[in-house]
């Protein structure tokens, strides 16, 4: 009989009694990890002090790398190696003060057998809350139980009690009483429209173009064809290298025409001459070529929406994609002709763009675009990061702040929009944003996500509000002043309810001219999704019936 050398299976260590193990998922980009490490270190120290005060020991699951200058897990491979050294049944806390790539720790968390808590610091300095929400959405999609908790420094009673509960029971449940299922809808014009558009989509189909899938480890942002196809939505898988190749075919003259159009529309470009730290005309020229190239490729493939990964694939190749993305999402935008000059592409309409190839946003943007257009509303839509927030004048006002672009109509027009160089920490080749302060008004917010093996959508109402200029600037300085900001007040949803429920780092927003119209649009959107077979959840205070 043949004898084979069998592998020696790894035996994880036993958990130490009354001990919590911690891990920290980070960025792939070394500059981001090094820059953010001091803030992460402070959060870990604050958390350790709280855990110790509650009578537990804390053991960090991986060492700080003095050569790299940080203590983050910075790749999927590194994460797998770290989890080999951790007791499988130990209580585990994922500590995040930064934007992190969920796939760095997903393999380990998926097979971990002990309770998992994801914590973040309540701060806008770096996107730790955004990182927490992305990991929460990814674990939800993976079907892995977990708990979440957030605090400024873990000295407050609310956070300490939450930590105590999790340490003693292995679970922590927050109030999500603001969420309820969709009741039967009345037979009105909005319901009829939503149902009709859903049936049209399912029957006639739509194509979303994906320029490289899986941006920045966002497992939650990948929706498999098996979930999309029953809605009538199909993917055209495209390569970012093809986008760069098409950019090279765009003439300088065509790109300059885009710049001239934007200058005439009143947009401000904050330019300089230092390529390493400032926005330059050369960077802008490249971005306008990307805008033209994206529309031409979309026309080639008959796309109904498009997403560009950018990070990581293009960040070392061309300037940021954000300016092109913001232009694509707006109705009024620089005209782009077919290669032979015979046709204007997607004339008089946006080409919905889903930032960071977030396919939950793709579905949502496609639905919103068709519905808002049919209702005669501005179909410009965008996603935002749920970055942070604080009370102002007796109301909790969220900072919704996507990393680079919104449609100009959300700012009140191009004359109220501006472009600044993207932060070098994330964008080594620069490129400009399409930024501004979102105009006050009524919005519908939403999020499509995967849970329990099927598609769900949360729908809610909010108001974009105006804050004094000094408060706006304070919030921008507390986060990323280069990026577009929306001051948002959710209707009937508290800060902690929203954090406990939301299953993604992103949410979608679209404007309506007044509250009554926004309520009608939400009702039609609920009917649209329900007819598609997506499970609809209503969040907060809504005027659902006419």
Where are these regions (language model features)?
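Short, well-structured alpha-helical segments in soluble
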Residues: 75-90, 110, 292-300
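Extended, charge-rich low-complexity interaction segments
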Residues: 86-92, 153, 178-185, 190, ...
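Cap/lid and interdomain-hinge subdomains that line or gate substrate/regulatory clefts
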Residues: 15-29, 55-59, 123-254
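Low-complexity, highly charged intrinsically disordered N-terminal segments
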Residues: 29-62
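N-terminal beta-loop-helix "entrance" segment that forms/cooperates
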Residues: 54-85, 245-255
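Anaerobic metallocofactor- and corrinoid-dependent redox/one-carbon enzyme cores
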Residues: 3-24, 32-45, 97-99, 114-122, ...
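Flexible loop/turn segments at secondary-structure boundaries
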Residues: 29-31, 67-70, 101-104, 125-126, ...
């Amino acid at each position: 009989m043949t004898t084979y050398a069998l592998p020696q299976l790894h035996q994880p260590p036993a958990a130490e009694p009354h001990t919590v193990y911690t891990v920290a998922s980070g960025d792939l980009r070394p500059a981001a990890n090094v820059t953010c490490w001091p803030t992460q270190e402070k959060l870990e120290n604050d958390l350790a002090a709280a855990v110790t005060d509650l009578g537990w020991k804390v053991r960090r699951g991986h060492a700080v790398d003095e050569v790299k200058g940080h203590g983050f897990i910075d790749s999927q491979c590194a994460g797998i190696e770290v989890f080999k050294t951790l007791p499988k049944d130990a209580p585990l806390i994922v500590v995040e003060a930064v934007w992190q790539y969920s796939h760095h720790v997903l393999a380990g968390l998926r097979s971990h057998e002990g309770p998992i808590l994801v914590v973040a610091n309540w701060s806008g300095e770096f996107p730790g809350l955004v990182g927490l929400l992305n990991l929460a959405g990814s674990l939800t999609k993976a079907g892995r139980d977990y708990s979440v908790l957030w605090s400024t420094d873990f000295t407050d009673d609310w956070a300490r009690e939450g930590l105590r509960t999790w340490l003693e029971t292995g679970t922590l449940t927050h109030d999500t009483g603001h969420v309820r299922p969709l009741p039967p809808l009345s037979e009105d014009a909005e319901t009829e429209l939503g149902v009709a558009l859903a049936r049209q989509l399912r029957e006639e189909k739509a194509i979303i173009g994906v320029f490289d899938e899986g941006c920045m480890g966002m497992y939650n942002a990948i929706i498999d064809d098996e979930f999309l196809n029953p809605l009538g939505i199909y993917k055209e898988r495209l390569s970012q290298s093809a986008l760069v190749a098409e950019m090279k075919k765009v003439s300088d003259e065509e790109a300059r025409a885009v710049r001239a159009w934007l200058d005439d529309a009143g947009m401000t470009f904050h330019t300089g001459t230092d390529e390493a730290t400032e926005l330059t005309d050369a960077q802008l020229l490249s971005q306008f070529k990307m805008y033209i190239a994206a529309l031409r490729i979309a026309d080639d493939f008959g796309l109904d929406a498009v997403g560009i990964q950018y990070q990581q694939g293009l960040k070392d190749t061309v300037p940021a994609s954000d300016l092109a993305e913001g232009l694509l999402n707006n109705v009024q935008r620089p005209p782009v002709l077919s290669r032979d000059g015979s046709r204007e592409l997607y004339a008089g309409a946006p080409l919905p763009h889903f930032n960071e190839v977030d396919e939950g946003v793709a579905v949502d943007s496609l639905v919103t675009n068709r519905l808002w257009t049919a209702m005669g509303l501005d179909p410009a839509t965008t996603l935002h990061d749920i970055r942070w927030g604080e009370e102002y004048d007796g109301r909790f006002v969220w900072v919704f702040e996507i990393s680079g672009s919104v449609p100009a109509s959300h700012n009140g027009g191009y004359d109220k929009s501006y472009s600044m160089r993207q932060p070098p920490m994330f964008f080594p080749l620069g490129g400009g944003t399409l930024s501004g302060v979102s105009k006050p008004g009524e919005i519908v917010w939403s999020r499509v996500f995967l849970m329990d093996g099927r598609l769900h959508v949360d729908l809610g109402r909010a108001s974009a509000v105006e804050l004094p200029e000094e408060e706006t600037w304070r919030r921008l300085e507390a986060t990323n002043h280069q990026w577009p900001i929306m001051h948002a007040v959710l209707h009937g949803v508290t800060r902690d309810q929203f954090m406990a429920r939301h299953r993604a780092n992103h949410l979608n927003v679209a404007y309506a001219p007044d509250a009554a119209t926004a309520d009608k649009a939400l009702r039609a959107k609920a009917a649209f999704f329900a007819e598609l077979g997506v499970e609809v959840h209503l969040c907060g205070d809504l005027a659902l019936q006419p």
